[in-house]
Amino acid sequence: MNYRASDFGRVAVLMGGWSAEREVSLVSGRAVLDGLRARGVDAVGIDFDREVVDRLRAGGCERVFNVVHGRGGEDGQLQGLLEIAGIPYTGSGVLGSALSMDKYRTKLVWQALGLPTPAFVLLESEADLARAEALGFPLMVKAALEGSSIGVYRVDDHAGLREAWQEAAACNSHVMAERCISGSEYTASILGEQALPLIRLETPREFYDYEAKYQANDTRYHIPCGLEPAEESALQALSLRAFAALGASGWGRVDLMRDEAGQPWLIEVNTVPGMTDHSLVPMAARAVGIDFPELVWQILTQTMERQHGE
């Protein structure tokens, strides 16, 4: 269905919040705000806090474009508030957001469904360190409830494992260790029911960390990704299945690896990905002729389709 900008009413672009990803979210939010206004949408920016529902109602906002990364905005809490308030919003619902935010439970779901994801161990005590070591070094140690590679460490020995566990636990999150995959890193951007062209990521760092994502100029993004069409299609299909398995919907991103034998491995899902000038979803959209204002327009129209059951 074709919509006019006036059909959406006033749209609140929620950004900021209180997570470790606040600054990135503010940059994403400003970009989304500019993109919506470029399409004539009556959009206002709101820095997300615990009084957000009252502020939305006071401002006459009829729907929300959510760009709050991390805890509070990406983990089901904001989604639950908006559901109770009856305010349509972009992206995944409560369940899909909560599951996808938790890297450990994400992998439990994929494992139960037979989807390929690297072997992993939850680190709750000293005894678990030995179980993690049995996976074989190198390992990735991750704070399970953080995004943007915050609280993520690559370790090569017992001392590094112990230190990384303690550092990640300081993020006030449960921590897991995961077998490190050697190979190429890809990301699949999800828009509606389709996976956009894959991007292959290349960084001189040990992995695609926070600096590589948002600050570095030496990260290389390959699109086309260099795979044969059938290989790329297979990874896109796997990404769509992994996304849906978590109850995620609307838009997002699936990160995966492909090892030296060509085996794919699912890593994680982002249900509110970055929308900065370094961000991957806008980059993938441009590859199929979707500019930034059109991208945010398409994401916003999903709120109408969900609201009216289209």
What are these regions (language model features)?
Residues 77-83, 207-215, 271:
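Short, flexible, mixed-charge acidic loops at enzyme active sites
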Residues 45-49, 175, 179, 249-261:
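A short glycine-rich, hydrophobically flanked beta-strand micro-motif that places a catalytic Asp/Glu
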Residues 156-237, 260-265:
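Phosphate-binding site of ATP-dependent enzymes
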Residues 109-114, 228-310:
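ATP-dependent carboxylate activation and anion-phosphoryl transfer catalytic cores
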Residues 1-15, 43, 58, 99-184:
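Active-site nucleotide/adenylate-binding loops and adjacent lid/helix of ATP-dependent enzymes
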Residues 1-108, 112, 124-130, 302-310:
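ATP-binding N-terminal substructure of ATP-dependent carboxylate-amine bond-forming enzymes
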Residues 13, 190, 256-258:
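Conserved hydrophobic "DFG−1" position in protein kinase catalytic cores
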